[in-house]
Structures are given as C-alpha cells and as structure tokens.
Amino acid sequence: MKLIIGVITLFPQMFDALKSGVIGRALKQDRLTLSFWNPRDYATDPHRTVDDRPYGGGPGMVMKFEPLALALKAAKAQLGENTKVIHLTPQGKLLTQAIVREKIHASPLILLAGRYEGIDERLIEAEVDEEWSIGDYILSGGELPAMVLIDAMTRLLPGVLGHKDSASQDSFTAGLLDYSHYTRPEKIADRPVPSVLLSGDHEAISRWRLKQSLGRTWQRRQDLIKRRSLSENEQRLLDEFFEESS
C-alpha cells in the first residue's frame, strides 16, 4: 500500500518537519508521496494576491477563489481528476481514528489548508468533497491539521512502524484509550512496575492491559465507553477496575 497526498498551502515549507521520524521513514521507503501546490503561484496579478476583504465587512481577509481553484486544477492534473479534496477547518466533522482508517484507502487525496478568516465559500461548494476538524479550537491555518492527518494515516501503512503490532495497539484503534506503559528500571522511588507485567504470563498481561484501557477510558473519555457495546468480559474487567480503584 502506498499513500499519495497532495497539499494546497501558502506555506509548503512548514511541511519540512515531516521529513523526520515515522513520516520521514515512509518517505524514504517510498510508501508515502507528498506533493505541494502554493495558491500564490497561481495568482494572476503582479502582486500575486491570494486574499481580499470580506463582503459585508468584518475583520481579516478571505482567501480568493481563483488562485485556489487553479492550484486544485494543477493538483488534479497530476493526481487524477477524481481525487477527493478534504478541507481542514474548525467547521468540519471531528476527525477520529475510524475516519483515518477509512481515508487511508481513499488515496490519493488532496488536503486544502486555509488561512486568514477562511476560504471563499464558493470554492468550498465547487471543489471540496469533505471538511474535517481536529478539534474544537482555532489555529492560524490548516497546515497543522493537515500534518496531523498525514501522520495519523502514515502510521497505518504496513511496515512503517518499528513493530508490526504498534499501530493495532494504539489508543482509539479498538475504540479505547491506551493502557499504561512501563520500562526499566523496575522501581523508581516508591513506584514499582505492576507485578503482573513481570510475571511472564502473557494471558494475565493482556487481561491487565485491557482492564487498564477500559478503566482509563471510563475515567477520561466516558463518551467512548457509552458508544461501545461492552462484552461480558469487558464489563467484568471494568467492574474489577472500579473495585481495585475504590
């Protein structure tokens, strides 16, 4: 599987940070291809203007239709006319791990990173297939959300992570938060590693980890528990967690 992503952005240099770590490894392995189109390169006036004042007044500037439309046209000429366009915006649907797993199979994709007060709505109506948000807060532009989506998808590519089970055991993969992790030394001050992790009993370790995942999710993200149908075993483990924590 290869992931092919195009990005429409005024600041392609921001994505240089992706050349390190997991994404850098995927790029070197040719498991991931990133291409960039800067709307400023498609502005037709001498000043290469990409924004203008909003109709109706108000603060800030709005990204213009034409430079974005031409940048998208160039991107689709390379990636394919039917390539889906995803706009990263606080007004979009909340991005989840389930959506990430779905999007990795929709490659190639074009990610549209807005700036300023936003993008002319007519561009969104004409060119955008989906809008996604990484949370209920405001950033300076869509570049960081685009990087978040790229990172989340890249982790799911087979062979990119160091261990074949790393992605399958991440938080949210099973709809739960991750369990606690420990490494050497065995004891730090008065805080020892839970004895079950030293037992060598893999069944007991798996049971403990699931119990911790269930308990942590209940404590921190009850919405995830409530939308999940717990099995009898999971409910029993969650009850044990409550008893042990009381």
Swiss-Prot record:
InterPro entries: Alpha/beta_knot_MTases, tRNA_m1G_MeTrfase_C_sf, tRNA_m1G_MeTrfase_TrmD, tRNA_m1G_MTases_N, tRNA_MeTrfase_TRMD/TRM10. S-adenosyl-L-methionine binds at G114, I134, G135, D136, Y137, I138, L139. GO terms for molecular function: tRNA (guanine(37)-N1)-methyltransferase activity. It catalyses: guanosine(37) in tRNA + S-adenosyl-L-methionine = N(1)-methylguanosine(37) in tRNA + S-adenosyl-L-homocysteine + H(+). Keywords: Cytoplasm, Methyltransferase, S-adenosyl-L-methionine, Transferase, tRNA processing. It is found in: Cytoplasm. Its EC number is 2.1.1.228. GO terms for biological process: tRNA N1-guanine methylation. GO terms for cellular component: cytosol. Homodimer. Belongs to the RNA methyltransferase TrmD family. Specifically methylates guanosine-37 in various tRNAs. This is tRNA (guanine-N(1)-)-methyltransferase. It comes from Coxiella burnetii (strain CbuG_Q212) (Coxiella burnetii (strain Q212)).
